[in-house]
């Protein structure tokens, strides 16, 4: 599954991102900038370590991890969270925990595109990426 997600991907559509960011507590200006961003995501592996690099006009971010092992990350919104990534059927699923809250980010292939569903509470955002 991870092999299929390797490569570089450019955001081509985004649904409900502003509401998702609002649910995370992001201010109006950050939410608006986030909606305009068309991030480019590069997923690579080195042995059993997976790296996800995200570049956008808003912020650049990189996480590197092993499946099933907890790691700390600073989210683009500035939250310090503990995250774990696992394979779940056809998806790479990341769970972020911070201050008693939890967000889930599910990455999977659908018709040759990478679909990323991010959820917190009952609010879900869907970003679709096309391979570059």
UniProtKB/Swiss-Prot annotation:
Tissue expression per record: Highly expressed in adult retina and testis with lower levels in cerebral cortex, kidney and epididymis. In the retina, strongly expressed in the ganglion cell layer and throughout the inner nuclear layer in amacrine and bipolar cells. Not expressed in the outer nuclear layer. In the testis, detected in the seminiferous tubules.
Organism domain of life: Eukaryota
SUPFAM superfamilies: Lipocalins
Entry-linked InterPro entries: Calycin (IPR012674), Fatty_acid-bd (IPR000463), ILBP (IPR031259), Lipocln_cytosolic_FA-bd_dom (IPR000566)
GO biological process: fatty acid transport
Transport found in the keyword field: yes
UniProt GO MF annotations: fatty acid binding
Keywords per UniProt: Lipid-binding, Transport
GO cellular component, one term: cytosol
Chain residues that bind a fatty acid: 107, 127-129
Family: Belongs to the calycin superfamily. Fatty-acid binding protein (FABP) family.
PANTHER family documented for this protein: FATTY ACID BINDING PROTEIN (PTHR11955)
Role description: May play a role in lipid transport.
Protein name: Fatty acid-binding protein 12
Species of provenance: Rattus norvegicus (Rat)
Gene: FABP12
């Amino acid at each position: 599954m991870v092999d299929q997600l390797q490569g570089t991907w450019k955001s081509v559509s985004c649904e409900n991102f502003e509401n998702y960011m609002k649910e995370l507590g992001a201010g109006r200006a950050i939410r608006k900038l986030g909606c305009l961003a068309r991030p480019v995501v590069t997923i690579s592996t080195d042995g059993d370590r997976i790296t996800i690099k995200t570049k956008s006009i808003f912020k650049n971010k990189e996480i590197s991890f092993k499946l099933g092992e907890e790691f700390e990350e600073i989210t683009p919104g500035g939250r310090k969270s503990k995250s774990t990534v696992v394979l779940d059927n056809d998806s790479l699923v990341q769970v972020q925990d911070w201050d008693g809250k939890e967000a889930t980010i599910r990455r999977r292939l659908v018709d040759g595109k990478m679909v990323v569903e991010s959820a917190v509470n009952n609010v879900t955002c869907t970003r679709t990426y096309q391979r570059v």
